[in-house]
């Protein structure tokens, strides 16, 4: 009696870089990286936004936590959590997905040699292009988040209610009145975030000196977190004045007042020093946030069978 033949196992499908599937997974990785991390630090963001709008509202960050907890309860610490989750998940899709796309397209456009020689410029151009599009996705939820977090009495109990009230009473365009300041804040931030991360990670691999194929997955992820945290500190500093202005514009813009006129009035009221309110907490917040985002994003890429960024 003959032994039945066992059909050979189908060859394992390998994932290819720079394919629609690759960009789709990078987009999903960006959603996971940004949506989860921004949601997790909602209490820090809440205190930061309120201090930007009213510097005297809390004597310090710890006092802010205690005050909110005692007056508004644990739920109060996560005021604005839902628009944060929705908005930054959408932004993460665009930020990381488009960055990978534009980085490859721009590198291909100039050729391999020039792409390496001018790689920092490629990182800057790709990240600026990606953020320009990502902020269009973020802006409505950012406007709702700031309004909910800084209004007293409470503006709305749900994201849907806040959206309805703004659109009905002020018009849909109100949700985008902070887009230009958001670009002013986020594009330099993202350019610094991606370009500095890429170069810091490159420097870390060079400093350690091992061949890249000798690193374990844990080591690669550790390098991504370290590089992300260092890049985040730089991001916080360069983007903070615009972050303050976005908070002010979304909470303190008079009816019929243009964004430029409102920004000029607010600057006259708070001065240059006022643009730096809340910087300390933002450095801690953005450093941790950026490190965690790169950790999640590169962990997801490795899990999908792709190399970590810079590896």
Curated annotation (Swiss-Prot):
Residues 45-67, 142-171, 242-269 are mitochondrial matrix. It is found in: Mitochondrion inner membrane. It comes from the Eukaryota. The chain crosses the membrane at residues 24-44, 68-88, 121-141, 172-192, 221-241, 270-290. The keyword Aminoacyl-tRNA synthetase does not apply. Residues 1-23, 89-120, 193-220, 291-311 are mitochondrial intermembrane. Belongs to the mitochondrial carrier (TC 2.A.29) family. This is Probable mitochondrial phosphate carrier protein. It comes from Schizosaccharomyces pombe (strain 972 / ATCC 24843) (Fission yeast). The lineage of its organism: Eukaryota, Fungi, Dikarya, Ascomycota, Taphrinomycotina.
